[in-house]
């Protein structure tokens, strides 16, 4: 009877040892507690970088060459001088993930454990993950703001005179020794042609779409002649992109103000490094405090000496972040650009106590996406 009991206890003990080994397929350690002789890899937690894609309109105004004679056409509110000014059309707010080198850990794992990481060393998945795509990659960390990218339209050559530019566009009929009075007569002739087209006085038979096209062409020519008096306004679209890596505020409930770029209607967009006296466009980061309870729990765990000693010796399953939801807003005059973003570094660092057989992380935020038994 005793032999049977001993064998039963031995089998039970072996089962416990076996299950313990299975449960220890992988473990994570802080760098100061990492075992030097163990097989493993270093991984970093994900942090969030905010991306601001800015669309700016560059408005170039040209004074008409006959602006002083605009009274001949009864025009008002004409452009009285050449000039350039800028206005912000749109700001798109988005995010991307980068590796947080200040929060790096060591992961030990056995040969049967499959570990997938991004190019920059952020964990994507652990365990036997089937068809797990690794297309989403953390972008390598870099300091500072990206230099603004502008479209090719920023460098536009301007013709020497207003009239020459319109002639080159084919919008004016060449008239020798053009004067304001001659331009007015040209407008009158073109309007008479439009009347002839509408009344059917033009020789020949034309389809409706041909008549419409001819009328619109004359309209465009009339507008060009009128522009010689009223002036012309050319609008170009310039595109910029800025990135900011915000740091978690000491008091989460307080809004964080982050400079993005400098802007003025006279000079347009400049980077923050620009030394000129220009207003700074600022983003307001308002935390929704969604990780408040997690922060309290982690604070309690950090004060548990027995738990901390156990973690130091045996490690944990894996460290990861619970991202915080943050309202990112930019106010520019009467325009408000806003979006709610998951910012990883504003959230809470935590860990799994054990080693689940399968675990998948969100490549953009580092949050737990799936956890198996």
Where are these regions (language model features)?
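Short, linear, compositionally biased motifs with a strong N-terminal bias
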Residues: 14-15
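N-terminal amphipathic/basic membrane-interacting segments and domains
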Residues: 24-373
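Bacterial N-terminal signal peptides that target proteins for export
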Residues: 1-10
């Amino acid at each position: 009877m005793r032999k049977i009991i001993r064998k039963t206890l031995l089998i039970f003990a072996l089962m416990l040892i076996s299950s313990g080994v299975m449960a220890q397929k992988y473990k994570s350690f802080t760098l100061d507690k990492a075992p030097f002789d163990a097989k493993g890899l270093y991984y970093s937690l994900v942090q969030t970088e905010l991306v601001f894609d800015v669309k700016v309109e560059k408005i170039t105004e040209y004074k008409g060459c006959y602006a002083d004679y605009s009274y001949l056409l009864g025009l008002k509110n004409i452009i009285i001088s050449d000039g350039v000014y800028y206005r912000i059309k749109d700001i798109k707010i988005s995010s991307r993930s980068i590796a947080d080198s200040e929060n790096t850990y060591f992961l030990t794992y056995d040969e049967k454990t499959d570990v997938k990481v991004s190019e920059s060393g952020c964990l994507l998945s652990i365990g036997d993950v089937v068809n797990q795509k690794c297309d989403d990659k953390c972008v390598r960390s870099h300091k500072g703001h990206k230099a603004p990218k502008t479209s090719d339209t920023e460098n536009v050559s301007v013709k020497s005179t207003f009239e020459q530019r319109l002639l080159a566009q084919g919008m004016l009929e060449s008239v020798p020794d053009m004067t304001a009075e001659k331009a007015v007569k040209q407008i009158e002739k073109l309007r008479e042609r439009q009347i002839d087209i509408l009344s059917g006085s033009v020789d020949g038979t034309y389809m409706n779409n041909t008549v419409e096209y001819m009328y619109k062409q004359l309209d465009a020519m009339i507008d060009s002649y009128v522009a010689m008096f009223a002036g012309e306004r050319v609008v170009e679209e310039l595109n910029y992109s800025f990135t900011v890596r915000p740091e978690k505020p000491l008091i989460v409930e307080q809004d964080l103000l982050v400079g993005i770029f400098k802007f003025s209607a006279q000079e347009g967009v400049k980077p923050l490094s620009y030394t000129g006296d220009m207003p700074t466009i600022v983003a307001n980061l308002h935390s929704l405090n969604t990780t408040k309870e997690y922060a309290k729990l982690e604070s309690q765990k950090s004060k548990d000496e027995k738990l901390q000693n156990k973690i130091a010796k045996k490690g944990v399953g894996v460290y990861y972040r619970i991202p915080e939801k943050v309202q990112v807003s930019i106010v520019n005059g009467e325009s408000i650009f806003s979006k709610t973003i998951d910012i990883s570094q504003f959230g809470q660092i935590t860990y799994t106590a054990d080693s689940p057989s399968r675990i998948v992380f969100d490549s953009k935020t580092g949050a737990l996406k799936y956890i198996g038994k």
